A protein has these predicted regions:
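Amphipathic alpha-helical segments
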Residues: 2-24
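Intrinsically disordered, low-complexity regulatory regions enriched in serine/threonine/proline
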Residues: 1-10, 31-164
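Long, charged, glycine-rich C-terminal linkers/tails
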Residues: 25-31
Length: 164
């Protein structure tokens, strides 16, 4: 699966993402910045539902929050969690082409809509667990106030995502 998937990412997904302004962080993780938000896409090839399938994950990360992993509401699997079969070169190529089509048609646009710090904080406010909003609001205020720790976290995130 890995060779077929790696080839499909290299020949199909990466050229598209590069044209959209993404940078390669690892062979399966890509990032770009929109407004002050870090947009990430990565290919999760760990399987899904006990089968050897691949998910593609998109997320918008606040510059002063965690940038590893994804959390609602600013992280999601594209195409409503669809998993693609990457077992053969043909299925991997077909799967990555479908991923590109989904990204082109609506997924990147949906990500762009929430790629604003205030908008992301507003989405967190609507979650049942109010701790998310409280925690991020405090971090946001420290970041806006140019608190040295908050700025250091943003810089560390930039380095981790190869945006520095």
């Amino acid at each position: 699966m890995a060779d077929a998937l790696t080839n499909a990412i290299t020949t199909t997904l990466w050229p598209f993402l590069k044209s959209e302004g993404f940078q390669k962080v690892t062979p399966r993780k890509f990032v770009r910045q929109r407004s002050e938000v870090f947009q990430q896409l990565w290919v999760d090839a760990n399987g899904s539902g006990g089968s050897k399938r691949t998910c593609v994950v998109l997320c918008a990360s606040l510059p002063f929050g965690p940038v590893h992993g994804y959390m609602d509401p600013h992280g999601s699997r594209i195409a409503n969690g669809r998993a693609w079969n990457m077992a053969t070169p043909e299925s991997a190529a077909n799967g990555m082409q479908q991923v590109v089509e989904v990204l082109q048609s609506h997924e990147l646009a949906k990500l762009d809509v929430i790629s604003d710090v205030e908008k992301l904080l507003g989405l967190l406010e609507n979650l049942p667990n109010r701790n998310w909003h409280s925690t991020y609001s405090q971090l946001h205020q420290r970041w806006r106030d140019k608190d040295p720790e908050a700025l250091a976290l943003e810089q560390a995130n930039r380095v981790a995502l190869k945006l520095a």
